[in-house]
Amino acid sequence: MKVIVLLLVLAVMQPVIQSQPFPGTEELPMTRRPPKKELEYWCTYAKSCDFCWNCRHGVCKNKVFEKHPLIKKNDYIQICRVSRYNDRCSYFTDSRIRRFHIMSCTNPTYYDWFDELMQVKEDRVIDVENIKHTCLCMIATIALIGYIRKQYSRMQLQAATRLLIFLGLYVLLGILMTNIIMNLPLSTDNPMQMRRPPERDLKFWCTYAKHCDFCWTCKDGMCKNKVFSDHPIITQNDYIVNCTVSRWHDRCMYEAHFRIHYQHNMNCSQPKDLEWFIELKRHLINQDDL
C-alpha cells in the first residue's frame, strides 16, 4: 500500500519537478549573446562564434581562453545564434550557408562546424554530365506521358486492358524516376566508398588510417607524408597498404586491402584511434601459426 501511495505522489509531483529549472539547463531563447557565465561552454563547442571574441583594429582576442593566440578578424569568426531547451543545446551560423547543430547539453559532442561550413562552400560544384542525364530522363518521361495519354483517348479498350496499360505505365515511370534520382549529384558530405578521399579530408583520414597509401607520396622507393610535414621519410614497403574509405552520415569506415581484408568502423565526430595495421599483422601472424 505504501508503495502505491509513493508512486501516486511521484506521478503528481513529476510535472512540478520537471518544470523546475536545473542550474545551467534552464531554457535559453534563441540569442546572439549567451549569458556571460555560459561563455566557456559555448566557446568550447562553437569556438568560431563572434560572441567568443573581442576584436579591435582587425585583431581578435578570445574572451574565454586566455592562452588562445590572437587572430586576425576574418571569415573564421561567424555570427552565431544559440538556444537551449531542456537538455538540448543548439547553435547555428548566420552566414551564406546556414549550419545548424543540436547536441545534448550535459553530454555535448564537439563539432567543428566552421570546417564543415567551408567544405560545403567548396563542394558546390555542378556535375554537368549528371545534370544533362537528369534533364534527358525528365524530357523522355514527360514526352512518354503525353504520347500515351493522346493514344489512350483514341482507343476503345476493356477495363482489364486499361488496368494493364496503367500498371505498365507506372512501372516504367518508376524506373525512369529511380534513374533520375540515382543520377542526381550526390552530396559530398556523405560520400560512399572511395579509394581517394577529398584533399580537405586527408588530415582526418591520415590521423586515424595513417598507413593508407593516399597519405603518402612515394618516389624512388622513399615516401613522404602528405599531411604531416614533420613525419620522417620512410622506405616504401608493406607498412603502406591500399585502403578504401567511406562515410555515411556520422559513421566513418576504412578498410585495408592486404593479404587479408581488414576494416575499422568509427564515429566520425568522435573517432577512436586504432592501430589497425598492428591488428592486421596480428591476424597474419595467427594465420601463419595455424
From Swiss-Prot:
It is a multi-pass membrane protein. Glycans are attached at N242, N267. The keyword ATP-binding does not apply. Keywords: Glycoprotein, Host membrane, Membrane, Transmembrane, Transmembrane helix. Pfam families: v110. It is found in: Host membrane. One of its GO terms (cellular component) is host cell membrane. InterPro entries: ASFV_fam_110 (IPR004848). It comes from the Viruses. Plays a role in virus cell tropism, and may be required for efficient virus replication in macrophages. Belongs to the asfivirus MGF 110 family. This is Protein MGF 110-9L.
